[in-house]
Regions:
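Residues at secondary-structure transition points
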Residues: 49-54, 78-82, 221, 225, ...
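Histidine-centered active-site/metal-ligand motif
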Residues: 14-17, 43, 226, 255, ...
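Nucleotidyltransferase catalytic core that binds NTPs
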Residues: 1-207, 298
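Divalent metal-dependent catalytic cores for phosphoryl transfer on phosphate-bearing substrates
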Residues: 213-217, 235, 239-362
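Charged phosphate-binding loop/patch that engages nucleotide di/tri-phosphates or the phosphate backbone
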Residues: 179-208, 369-397
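N-terminal leader/targeting helix
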Residues: 81-91, 95-98, 257-289, 375-385, ...
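Internal alpha/beta core interface subdomains
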Residues: 361, 365-369
């Protein structure tokens, strides 16, 4: 069997990665490509990375419809730095009778002799080099010849030139230039948006403290205790579902920031700032606290992340097709530790960590049952959301 290992951080994986793997499969008559997702590589700044689980998820999404391509997770679960020679020593022991190859970019080849124990790698695998557009082929061929003189094993060029797009460009420009998204599998693009990866906004513990103090001044004591419960539950759910935890906590802290103002003020804020008010919201102005909270999030508390604002806006009614943060805040608001009157809370609290969509649906189901007993309070958005997640549970969405 002829197998090839394609190593990298894949932060994120993009279409040229898949194209290179496909070109190598065809050119060298390979049987299998394994994307070896790096854990803690010695040459990367870990501050630039995202949760390992997110990188793994994106690789799985990118390759799930690609025949002959699979994933190797050994480095993700290894403690300490991820040195390639360790992985290739293991792989060779696992496949003693197989021909093993290693795909690397042309930039990596130029420094291969400076890697830790490159001679071990070359003893275990032949090196396949992926050139990029703009490479000086004379320099690249000289580097290949030098490596051949220094190490055992073969070094060969893949007959494919990658466009030279670096993953760092996607990370930096994802929200600024939609053209870079054309280099991504649509499922990977959707995952990045849903998990708020590479966001220009980041938060730290100082932001948590600042906004917590603001809420302590703005809210009644019982509402503030509830807010802390939602924030900590959102943090926990974010860790479970691979969403930036501090971002989720900020959304939890601010979700009720307009809860303790008067109905008259909520209506006035909406009318002054052209925030649409539906008939039922005029009838029950407390329903506006999400919309007003989303406005205050930016105008009063200097939090400009659109995902946070949207999660605050829909945290009471939900909406069809909620993103991940929407669901985290919607659920956290319902199941936080201070809640004790809703039905089947123990089941919901468990379900939130097993299947978030299922938990959302169960909450909507209980909410609709309550509203059916109080039909004058029915909000059409809640009904639309319930119907959407009912279809989702049936596999029709």
């Amino acid at each position: 069997m002829r197998i090839v290992i394609y190593g990298g951080t894949f932060n994120p994986i993009h279409n040229p990665h898949i194209d290179i793997a496909g070109a190598a499969l065809k050119q060298f008559s390979l049987d299998k490509v394994y994307f070896l997702v790096a854990g803690n590589p010695p040459h990367k700044d870990t501050a630039e990375t995202i949760p390992d689980a997110c990188r793994l998820d994106m690789v799985k999404l990118a390759i799930e419809d690609e025949p002959g391509i699979d994933i190797d997770v050994r480095e993700i679960y290894r403690t300490g730095k991820s040195y390639s020679y360790i992985s290739f020593t293991e792989i060779k022991k696992e496949h003693p009778e197989d021909d093993i190859f290693f795909i690397m970019g042309s930039d990596s080849l130029l420094y291969f002799k400076n890697w830790v124990k490159p001679e071990v790698i070359s003893q275990c695998a032949d090196i396949l080099v992926a050139p990029r557009f703009g490479d000086d082929m004379a320099v690249l061929n000289d580097a290949i010849n030098e490596c051949k003189s220094l190490f055992t094993g073969d070094f060969a060029l893949i007959d494919y030139k990658a466009n030279g797009l670096a993953s760092s460009v996607i990370r930096n420009d994802f929200y600024k230039d939609e053209n870079v998204r054309n280099w991504l599998n649509p499922k990977v693009e959707e995952y990045i948006i849903d998990h708020n990866l590479y966001s220009p906004y980041s938060y730290d513990y100082e932001d948590i403290l600042r906004l917590s103090q603001e809420m302590k001044k703005e809210l009644k004591s019982s509402r503030y205790v509830h807010t802390l419960g939602v924030a900590t539950t959102a943090y926990s759910l974010a860790l479970k579902w691979n969403y930036p935890a501090y971002t989720a906590m900020i959304a939890g802290i601010l979700h009720d920031c307009a809860k303790c103002i008067s109905d008259e003020k909520r209506i006035a804020v909406c009318e002054k700032n052209n925030i649409p008010i539906r008939d039922i919201e005029y009838q029950y102005p407390h329903l506006l606290h999400g919309k007003v909270g989303a406005y205050y999030c930016k105008s009063k508390y200097d939090v400009f992340d659109e995902q946070i604002a949207h999660a605050i806006a829909v945290h009471t009614t939900g909406c069809p097709g909620m993103n991940l943060l929407d669901k985290i805040i919607f659920v956290a608001d319902y199941i936080e530790p201070g809640r004790d009157k809703q039905p089947r809370l123990d089941i919901l609290r468990s379900e939130a960590y097993r299947d978030l969509d299922s938990c959302v649906f169960m909450i909507l189901e209980d909410t609709v049952n309550y509203l059916n007993e109080n039909p004058e309070m029915v909000d059409s958005t809640t009904i639309d959301t319930y119907n959407y997640y009912l279809d989702k549970m049936k596999g029709e969405v």
